[in-house]
Curated annotation (Swiss-Prot):
SUPFAM superfamilies: Protein kinase-like (PK-like). One of its GO terms (cellular component) is nucleus. Gene3D superfamilies: Phosphorylase Kinase, domain 1, Transferase(Phosphotransferase) domain 1. It catalyses: L-seryl-[protein] + ATP = O-phospho-L-seryl-[protein] + ADP + H(+); L-threonyl-[protein] + ATP = O-phospho-L-threonyl-[protein] + ADP + H(+); [DNA-directed RNA polymerase] + ATP = phospho-[DNA-directed RNA polymerase] + ADP + H(+). Residues 503-512, 539-548 have a biased composition (Polar residues). InterPro entries: CDK (IPR050108), Kinase-like_dom_sf (IPR011009), Prot_kinase_dom (IPR000719), Protein_kinase_ATP_BS (IPR017441), Ser/Thr_kinase_AS (IPR008271). Residues 400-411, 487-502 have a biased composition (Low complexity). Belongs to the protein kinase superfamily. CMGC Ser/Thr protein kinase family. CDC2/CDKX subfamily. This is Serine/threonine-protein kinase BUR1. The gene is BUR1. It comes from Debaryomyces hansenii (strain ATCC 36239 / CBS 767 / BCRC 21394 / JCM 1990 / NBRC 0083 / IGC 2968). CDD domains: STKc_BUR1. Serine/threonine-protein kinase involved in transcription regulation. Phosphorylates the UBC2/RAD6 ubiquitin-conjugating enzyme (E2), leading to monoubiquitination of histone H2B and the silencing of telomeric-associated genes. Also required for histone H3 methylation. Necessary for the recovery from pheromone-induced growth arrest in the cell cycle G1 phase. SMART domains: S_TKc (SM00220). It comes from the Eukaryota.
Length: 608
């Protein structure tokens, strides 16, 4: 009796096989396939619903490849039907913009007990050329900046690939950025045909609408963020337009560097679509009311179109027109691949760059998203650290002073430069209360009483200083210093009227003011209620024409124009001059103030 050939099944109690020695092993039905041991696994590239992708190297040829392990979700299902469809379709397609399968691998299961052979299944791998990047990785990488010519190059290749697929009577049904790969030469390839199907009907032609639509298919296709509105509303007899909607989403994503329609549910996805392209109506999509999920149309009743305003800063009018044609609600009015390829967007400057002219991008895949996210955060932190803070301008009256605990006043709405703090020369001087803002345009001279002794120094007040006059009155002075306006009289002849004026200064004995002769007249000369009534400084009485004791000393560089400080209200026009005036070191060392000190000594000697 002849011994039966080895088969995958085992007959343990068959009487006809008792006299034969049977070797329990499966029949080698995959003898032409490669083995996994022929490849060296380098790293994992990604994982999806239908498989795990790994980067590997052929040990013999040293060629880099991508191994896609086909996942069996249940041991009873056998070979995945999606993988069978993908392999069958890819064997019929041959285009430079479509990813090929160059080999298949079957890895036998490791069986310790021969009785478990029926319950153990091997693993299948598809072998395809290694692609250094995918579109998600390029857009997530902060080191890569895509120019318009680069985007046109990618879009042109993508449209050529999808046009070839539609011509061969296939629907891809899963167009998204993660399924668009780019090799080292800049060639774009469409991958992942696990959801692809043959469609029935005429193929699309130029300006003739989509192809297909003669047969019903499942609606559970296309990733939600790239799913067209007809699928969201329950259309089963869809056309090649479902792929063109996904290409429109990818086109917008190339500019925004992130998905443009990120819905959490199908209803939310429909709302985002209506917010972008406008709600469906009798003009934009007349057949929408006949779809099974037409109740979702109520979501778009309050939506307004925002596509032009959202993408106007990112692309030119031709690009917006192409995007609008690809994202048209009505699938029979939507651009097909031939319509898009003949659009003016690809004919105007800048022209699409050739694939071999594209820059050599670094390797980046979807699995690198977290690494790129950390890199972007690091760059943003460095940018914020080096960012120069902007000046704060008040938004309303009184905001500037209120933010600094100052009460509202006539200068409350003007942000001005802060004056320099005065320098102190001895321990007897106390720090003056210097306001944080002043304004020359709203300055009103402080009214003074003309009675004798009314202008004597008063006690320090806790009220904030809000004018130049109060600043001059309350600021610290060096001991024996008198601040005053220059007199038109000769500086060598110090009269009682000119020397008796003590404007904003301090006297060693304030009681002498009662005995001063003609004090009222002297006060009236220098202290008036109007700026126009103040006497103009006499050029002959400047610091260059004072007594001989001041001419002998050589003026310092910062004292060359000290005469400009004689008329405070006329000369101080901006914050720089204000800072110069409040530089107390320069002010007290000026020749004119030395002259005032000399006059004070003569006054004290005369009335002491």
């Amino acid at each position: 009796m002849e011994c039966p050939e080895p088969s995958e099944s085992v007959i343990p109690n068959d009487q006809s096989t008792k006299s034969c020695s049977i070797k329990l092993q499966p029949m080698n039905r995959f003898r032409d396939m490669s083995k996994l041991r022929n490849y060296e696994i380098i790293q994992k590239l990604g994982q999806g619903t239908f498989g795990v992708v790994q980067k590997a190297r052929n040990i013999k040829t040293k060629e880099l490849v991508a191994l896609k392990q086909l996942i069996n979700h249940s041991a009873k299902e056998g070979f995945p039907i999606t993988a069978m469809r993908e392999i069958t379709i890819l064997k019929k397609l041959n285009h430079k913009n479509i990813l090929k399968i160059i080999d298949m691998i079957y890895e036998e299961p490791k069986i310790s007990n021969p009785q478990d052979i029926l319950h153990q299944r091997g693993c299948f791998y598809t072998v395809s050329p290694y692609m250094c990047s995918d579109l998600v990785g390029l857009l997530e990488n902060p080191n890569i900046n895509l120019e318009v010519s680069h985007i046109k190059c990618f879009m042109e290749q993508l449209l050529h690939g999808i046009q070839y697929i539609h011509e061969q009577m296939f629907l891809h049904r899963d167009i998204k950025a993660a399924n668009i790969l780019i090799d080292r030469n800049g060639t774009l390839k469409i991958a992942d045909f696990g959801l692809a199907r043959v469609y029935h009907g005429s193929p699309p032609k130029f300006m003739s609408g989509p192809g297909g639509g003669e047969r019903a298919y499942t609606g559970l296709v296309v990733t939600r963020w790239y799913r067209p509105p007809e699928l969201l509303l329950g259309e089963r007899r869809y056309t090649t337009a479902v792929d063109m909607w996904g290409i429109g989403c990818v086109f917008g994503e190339l500019f925004t560097r992130k998905p443009i329609l990120v819905g959490k549910t199908d209803s939310h996805q429909a709302q985002l679509i209506f917010d972008l392209v406008g709600p469906p109506n009798s003009i934009s999509w007349s057949e929408a009311t006949s779809l099974p999920n037409k109740h979702d149309l109520n979501i778009g009743l309050t939506c307004q179109r925002s596509l032009e305003s959202k993408f106007a800063p990112l692309m030119n009018p031709d690009g917006i027109n192409l995007l609008s044609g690809l994202l048209t609600l009505d699938p029979y009015k939507r651009f097909n691949a031939l319509d898009a390829l003949n659009h003016n967007y690809f004919k105007n400057e800048p022209l699409p760059m050739k694939p071999q002219e594209l820059p050599k991008f670094e390797e980046c895949h979807e699995i690198d998203k977290e690494r790129f996210k950390l890199l972007r955060e690091k760059k943003n932190n460095i940018h914020e650290a080096n960012k120069i803070p902007k000046a704060h301008f008040p938004k309303g009256p009184g905001e500037y002073n209120n933010s600094n605990n100052y009460p509202r006043n006539r200068n409350g709405s003007f942000p001005l430069a802060l004056p320099k703090q005065p320098k102190f020369y001895n321990q007897h001087q106390q720090e003056a209360h210097v306001p944080q803002q002043m304004h020359t345009d709203t300055y009103i001279p402080k009214k003074r009483d003309d009675k004798p002794g009314a202008n004597a120094p008063q006690k320090e007040s806790s009220e904030p200083i809000t004018s130049y006059q109060s600043l001059r009155d309350r600021s610290p002075r060096r001991e024996g210093h008198i601040s005053r306006k220059p007199s038109t009289t000769n500086s060598n002849n110090i009269s009682s009227n000119s020397s008796a004026s003590n404007v904003g200064g301090t006297l060693s004995n304030p009681t002498h003011q009662k005995n001063r002769p003609n004090a009222k007249a002297s006060a009236g000369i220098f202290m008036t209620n109007s700026r126009k009534q103040r006497p103009k400084p006499n050029p002959q009485s400047s610091s260059r024409n004072v007594s001989d004791q001041f001419k002998k000393r050589k003026l310092l560089p910062d004292e060359q124009n000290e005469s400009d400080l004689t008329d405070f209200d006329e000369d101080v026009k901006d914050s720089k001059q204000l800072d110069s005036f409040l530089d107390w070191d320069t002010f007290t060392r000026s020749p004119e103030n030395r002259k005032l000190q000399h006059e004070k000594k003569q006054f004290e000697t005369k009335y002491s």
